[in-house]
Amino acid sequence: MEKLARKSVQKLTPYLSARRIGGTGDVWLNANESPFDNEYRTNFARLNRYSDCQPKALIAAYAAYAGVKPEQTLTSRGADEGIELLIRAFCEPNEDAILYCPPTYGMYSVSAETIGVERKTVPLTEDWQLDLSGIEANLDKVKLVFVCSPNNPTGNLVKREDIIALLEMTKDRAIVVMDEAYIDFCPEASTVDLLAQYSNLAILRTLSKAFALAGLRCGFTLANEELINVLLKVIAPYPVPVPVAEIATQALSEAGLARAKFQVLDLNANRAYLQVGLSMIAGLEVFEGWGNYLLVKFPNGDELFKAAWESGIILRNSPIKDCVRISVGSRDECEKTLGFIRNYYS
């Protein structure tokens, strides 16, 4: 059957998510998931009816949380669908291109390749910031520029002045897509205030991380109303199941937001605990992180990753040499991981 598939799909290497990689253990710190398992009320009385394309209560709740108008808000099956919608809506296959800056999230590349859109890369600088001159030199045919901040897997924030410079550079040429999947851990760094000034800005958000709803698959795209209307032309007719909309709306209620804020404070404290503990181990380089994960450089990253895996501590290997990404879990999970790494290098 594979020979019937499009040639580009035959050559495609799928994104290796944490679940596809697998593993067995009792400490799962490989997918930047929340350790909190919150309870929600669900109503299954209306499952015989299709959901609204854009459930009004959910859109209103997230728009209020994000500080934008409902008309500037689109919900989808995770932020990953937002990536795909943007590429499908704005890029002509075999004609246009996207641009992204590795090391960064892998789905920009996979989504573009699946659709048949050229992928241009301009690597981040040594301190993992944007190479603005390199981006400018490669903007020909580019319709979308993806920037992740906090960046996954490095954890750093992209300089605000560089984001503004990029928006100015791409005016009337391309859309800058800010992936803010982890912005709830550092909301002061959001670019949402720039939407009023730049019509070529789109922002991706998710409930998977800070809201502890990775299994729900609920994301958002924030942009000007004209851009949102373009995305509504290509989105599926019923993208958000009824239970998803109900649970997500509960998570964005006053009580839900208070709980999420408390849990973010807890996870940020655990990140600081893990960062300090790891930095005290000789030979390790711990990079400052702003999301719910840390990137750590080990003397022998692959060996450390394998040893942890065999001990039931599932971390995430990185394309960066000798680096491993560690999600911030519960304090108990952080203590177990820190204890294992200490013993490994003792």
From Swiss-Prot:
A Pfam family annotated for this UniProt entry: Aminotran_1_2
Entry-linked Gene3D superfamilies: Aspartate Aminotransferase, domain 1, Type I PLP-dependent aspartate aminotransferase-like (Major domain)
Catalytic activity of the protein: L-histidinol phosphate + 2-oxoglutarate = 3-(imidazol-4-yl)-2-oxopropyl phosphate + L-glutamate
Coiled coil regions, renumbered to chain: none
Enzyme class, first EC level, given as a word: transferase
InterPro entries per UniProt: Aminotrans_II_pyridoxalP_BS (IPR001917), Aminotransferase_I/II_large (IPR004839), HisP_aminotrans (IPR005861), PyrdxlP-dep_Trfase (IPR015424), PyrdxlP-dep_Trfase_major (IPR015421), PyrdxlP-dep_Trfase_small (IPR015422)
Membrane spanning residue stretches: none
GO molecular function: histidinol-phosphate transaminase activity; pyridoxal phosphate binding
GO biological process terms, semicolon-separated: L-histidine biosynthetic process
Keywords: Amino-acid biosynthesis, Aminotransferase, Histidine biosynthesis, Pyridoxal phosphate, Transferase
Keyword Transferase: yes
Pathway(s) this gene product operates in, as recorded in its UniProt entry: Amino-acid biosynthesis; L-histidine biosynthesis; L-histidine from 5-phospho-alpha-D-ribose 1-diphosphate: step 7/9
EC number: 2.6.1.9
Entry cofactors: pyridoxal 5'-phosphate
Residue positions, PTM N6-(pyridoxal phosphate)lysine: K209
Family indicated by similarity: Belongs to the class-II pyridoxal-phosphate-dependent aminotransferase family. Histidinol-phosphate aminotransferase subfamily.
Self-association state and partner proteins as the record states: Homodimer.
PANTHER family hit by this protein: HISTIDINOL-PHOSPHATE AMINOTRANSFERASE (PTHR42885:SF2), HISTIDINOL-PHOSPHATE AMINOTRANSFERASE-RELATED (PTHR42885)
Protein name as it appears in the record: Histidinol-phosphate aminotransferase
Gene name, Swiss-Prot/TrEMBL: hisC
